[in-house]
Amino acid sequence: MKGPSIVVKGARAHNLKGVDIELPKNKLIVMTGLSGSGKSSLAFDTIYAEGQRRYVESLSAYARQFLGQMDKPDVDTIEGLSPAISIDQKTTSKNPRSTVATVTEIYDYIRLLYARVGKPYCPYHGIEIESQTVQQMVDRILELEERTKIQLLAPVISHRKGSHEKLIEDIGKKGYVRLRVDDEIVDVNEVPQLDKNKNHTIEVVVDRLVVKDGIETRLADSIETALELAEGNLTVDVINGEELKFSENHACPICGFSIGELEPRMFSFNSPFGACPTCDGLGQKLKVDLDLVIPDKNKTLNEGAIEPWEPTSSDFYPTLLKRVCEVYKINMDKPYKKLTDRQKNILMNGSGEKEIEFTFTQRNGGTRKRKMVFEGVVPNIDRRYHESPSEYTREMMSKYMTELPCETCHGKRLSKEALSVYVGDYNIGEVVEYSIKNALYYFENLKLSDQDKSIADQILKEIISRLSFLNNVGLEYLTLDRSSGTLSGGEAQRIRLATQIGSRLTGVLYVLDEPSIGLHQRDNDRLINTLKEMRDLGNTLIVVEHDDDTMRAADYLVDVGPGAGNHGGEVVSSGTPNKVMKDKKSLTGQYLSGKKRIEVPEYRREITDRKIQIKGAKSNNLKNVNVDFPLSVLTVVTGVSGSGKSSLVNEILYKALAQKINKSKVKPGNFDEIKGIDQLDKIIDIDQSPIGRTPRSNPATYTGVFDDIRDVFAQTNEAKIRGYQKGRFSFNVKGGRCEACKGDGIIKIEMHFLPDVYVPCEVCDGKRYNRETLEVTYKGKNIADVLEMTVEEATHFFENIPKIKRKLQTLVDVGLGYITLGQQATTLSGGEAQRVKLASELHKRSTGRSIYILDEPTTGLHVDDISRLLKVLNRIVENGDTVVIIEHNLDVIKTADHIIDLGPEGGEGGGTIIATGTPEEIAQNKGSYTGQYLKPVLERDSVE
């Protein structure tokens, strides 16, 4: 290969079979192949892992102890490596304090902008706050009641870390006798040793006065002294009154509302200086929700209308409720909705000061008499949630609470002072509510004075450049205050991508995992141009991707396969996309060249009158839309990123159905009415969340096939002779499991400030079971051997047991024949977890009254895997059930019976129904972006 290259020899991570490959440097390299073929093992677990490990090895021993020891990948040699950065989908922060603006560091620059050129205004009078003179301060203090005792304090240290010994010594030398340290008055010579790792506030007591006539001169002199000491700031400690704060810098001349010096930390909702004191900077408060407390208002109190007070092992609350109703003459057999407002108010908010006496039965069967004020259901739930030491009680009470915007900051997260500062016409809380597209326009057209312009010029350049990168990767619809926990994997990855371009590093190896996820075809070109821009800076990009356009745009394409799991792990073909297309061995090449394809179905299923109707959908950006979801067909919901697909399907359709059918406590998005639910009795949301969060969960336990396998082992002669029941073969209970590792097969070693290390259990060698259990075999294999089989191997092994074979076959049908039965749930990718869930539904008997909801099921799937997935989904529909999919993949869209296309744009520009109908009807709609891209695909792939 001409030019510099990365040479990999003998890569054996996971299923790789000693792979040797040479990759060109400073190029856009795309790795593709079937799900489970080994492409991620080559890209992430070999090339990235070694690049990262070598970089960490070059650091000092001190720095390395914080980064942890990185294992050397199973590879002979890798030459030509650069420092590596991985941009995958797993590292989205779920921290509620993390937003799009903070993750991209745009917020840091916006805070700096507001601190440097912001103009504070009084929130009560709308007057710009300017500096106060000493005379104004004197006048304000003299307004206090006569004989009021005051202390004038000079705040020399305000909430800063350090022991501050030198400063305290200097204050003493200047002749000052007293200080107020962390709200305690102390003698300057008796200040206790301050913890240098904690924040402290130190104020010098400049003077002590009593407000009366004739103190003006002394007061003015003392104020001047304090202002000089504390750089223009003054605190007046009013004994038995509210403290006053003054500043030579900023205060309202009418009401004295004053803001200290503008600093970036004042605009941070993660700092006590900037956060709203009510919600601590979260913007939300957990409040009791009456719709969750009384889900069915047609019920009477005797029928259990107040759900959290349903009878338990103690009849405390039912007895209390009965007594309250007797005292206030509330009919317990009348539907709740027919009670008077006064009666509802007593039940929900309490009876005031009046005490109520009642006798209740305790858990031990004894009785007890109580006399108490009836606090009401709402305060009771709130109190038990906030004050109970029991985790269980708090969890139970949280079911009846909802996150609502904070009443003080109205969801803006910041203090009154921070929200009083404006740049142009907007405060910082209003600016971060903009979408990226609107924020970019705002900052590009911001009008500032010449002086402010010279101060803000560099800051604005940084803000605009970062916003431009986000705009260029198709994220213009996201708002800056959007919580990062609500972002999809693709969105989070593209945000990190934009952040990396902003850093403008060169000579770096970037490894990316399907950056096109969740991106509409329309925005793909922008993403590809971004990748090329990173390459042109002098970087090497290795992108694991299945997207047709990205593969064609690659400088170098690597097809890993030929199959998945044990049937994969080899490089089938590599070279330019054209070279791979001509390679007959390459499955990817055959699809790219058009020799293989997913056909458009010969006919579409008929749309009948059976449907779910949603009226007045208004969740997030949906604009009061009415939509029908036909039943017993395959419906695909399409639209550009941010057009409202998830709001319609996940927030409204799924949650509204789950609330009615599954009696779920989740609250759906805002809508007026939903009709047709009586035609369904089951709703299944098949998402990409893990099938379990512990190593104990695996595909065998999740699908239920492990129960049947344990039955088989319990029926063997050896098990019967020993008296072993089915439970003996469970690794979750005592008996048959290895007690050294409690059936985990691995032991966790806590490393304190290093990541926890997991090592195989030495007693059972990672087999999870004790020796006696492993002596029981079926067809020569013990239970641990079976868990180590791939699904495909197990299907052949149990082919004479129809019950087991049927369940395993569904895993094979969804393309998971390569995973092992005992593979830890935590090691499955999102796409694999989703297909395990799909398989576990497939083997259940169909009723024709079920609806399946899938959000981008093609994530992580090769086009050949998609072909298999479509067969499975069509099997579900053939049984009379309904499938609703959110999808951008044109191979899935073209096979739909019915399409609902949202748009036209993302964010505020979306939220309307652009078109509905068959793929052919959508393709004819000139206003639909989906239709524009669908039309050529339908013409190309239709059955001739």
From Swiss-Prot:
Keywords of the record: ATP-binding, Cytoplasm, DNA damage, DNA excision, DNA repair, DNA-binding, Excision nuclease, Metal-binding, Nucleotide-binding, Repeat, SOS response, Zinc, Zinc-finger
Quote the InterPro entries the UniProt record gives: ABC_transporter-like_ATP-bd (IPR003439), ABC_transporter-like_CS (IPR017871), ATP_grasp_subdomain_1 (IPR013815), P-loop_NTPase (IPR027417), UvrA (IPR004602), UvrA_DNA-bd (IPR041552), UvrA_inter (IPR041102)
Chief localization: cytoplasm
Q: Which residues form the signal peptide?
A: none
Subcellular location, record wording: Cytoplasm
* ZnF (C4-type) residues: 252-279, 738-764
Domain ABC transporter: residue ranges: 309-587, 607-935
Q: Which residues bind ATP?
A: 33-40, 639-646
Keyword Protein biosynthesis annotated: no
Which Gene Ontology MF annotations are present? Answer: ATP binding; ATP hydrolysis activity; DNA binding; excinuclease ABC activity; zinc ion binding
Role, per record? The UvrABC repair system catalyzes the recognition and processing of DNA lesions. UvrA is an ATPase and a DNA-binding protein. A damage recognition complex composed of 2 UvrA and 2 UvrB subunits scans DNA for abnormalities. When the presence of a lesion has been verified by UvrB, the UvrA molecules dissociate.
Summarize the subunit comment: Forms a heterotetramer with UvrB during the search for lesions.
Family (UniProt): Belongs to the ABC transporter superfamily. UvrA family.
Please state what the protein is called: UvrABC system protein A
Organism of provenance: Staphylococcus epidermidis (strain ATCC 35984 / DSM 28319 / BCRC 17069 / CCUG 31568 / BM 3577 / RP62A)
